[in-house]
Amino acid sequence: FVQFHPTGMVWPPSVKGTLITEGVRGEGGVLKNSDGERFMFDNIPEMFQGEYAETEEEATRWVNAVVADERPDARRPPELLTRDVVARAIRREVRAGRGSPHGGVFLDIASKRSPEAIKRKLPSMYHQFKELANVDITTDPMEVGPTCHYTMGGVRVDPDSQETSVPGLFAAGEVAGGMHGANRLGGNSLSDLIVFGKRAGEYAAQHAKDREAMSDVDAEEVERQAETMLAPFHREQGENPYTIHEDLRLMMQDKVGIVRTEEDLVEALEALTALRERAATVRIGGNIGFNPGWHLALDLENMLDISEAVTRSALMRQESRGAHTREDYPDTDDVTWGKQNLVTRQAEDGSVEVRAEPLPEMPEELKELIKD
């Protein structure tokens, strides 16, 4: 489950994907297509019908009340629907040919708030667009589009200690399989980090304290790993890692992005195989002293592993749930998939293996908390 934030910068290319805070929409910013239409009113899912404003007048009343720190007597604007809903709606407008010049939509705060109010309430956004895109958001709309934001899955950890399946290795936060299920709510990542980061730190400290001695280090294995890491410096021919990284990014966005199909996912797996072959022969220059190209060359293997794990899991999960949307399986299947987790691991032959495992039974103390 990969979450896409609905509003990231789409232009210029050097800053594509840079996040635009939801505060812009909270302050009254509206999403419009190239025809000037507020399309979110036409994209309220059935499950949210009745909970969001159905007219611009009602949406404006809600914003004005909130900005004035008053209790609103109206429903919130549909621009504030969950991230997956807004991201899919933007994608739909772009694919229908109603997108902005650079492949996004327009986020307009200029027509809703005075320049003084925008600079006072959204100073970082004002400076971000002024400096990075030469756009004055007090007079002109922003071009925005969905950007990859958060991974809900992660490595398997013990829920109490946060220890992974590797003894002595602890994990917390986005890297760990956590509490967010298929769709994280905004702000919950911070709570996750505070609670489980504290646990991980405490148990890691206790683990270190209880150890009597360090394990012996295999010198030959260290040498082999060093040779592998330094190999890109010694190749006479090979591709630039930045080229492969960009091709990987574009392919995953296109084939394994906001909306997925079996055809696209199968094509993505074929593309990943080809990208792995290219990544195995990357060549870099310079030396080991602060060399971003070398860092990227080393990261590519991890990026490819994660990309394949996400793709294979998305192909296996024949339903739509949270941030995972299958166009060919649009419904949520609680009977089959509501009771299973998908677990990826490295098979004996080195390939990525995916299998379904039943959800563990909820501990009694948690059941009691839910009752209360």
Where are these regions (language model features)?
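C-terminal amphipathic alpha-helical interaction region
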Residues: 281-372
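Long, amphipathic alpha-helical stalk/connector segments used for oligomerization, subunit docking
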Residues: 207-292
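A conserved FAD-binding loop/helix module that cradles the flavin
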Residues: 117, 166, 178-204
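An anion/pyrophosphate-binding glycine-rich loop and adjacent beta-alpha core
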Residues: 1-131, 203-209
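FAD-binding beta-loop-beta segment adjacent to the flavin cofactor pocket
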Residues: 149-170, 175-176, 184
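A glycine-rich phosphate-binding loop feature that marks nucleotide/adenosyl-phosphate handling sites
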Residues: 2-12, 143-151, 213-230, 323-335
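Short beta-alpha connecting loops at secondary-structure transitions
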Residues: 12-17, 76, 180-189, 227-234, ...
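Active-site and channel-lining beta-strand-loop segments
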Residues: 28-41, 147, 153-162
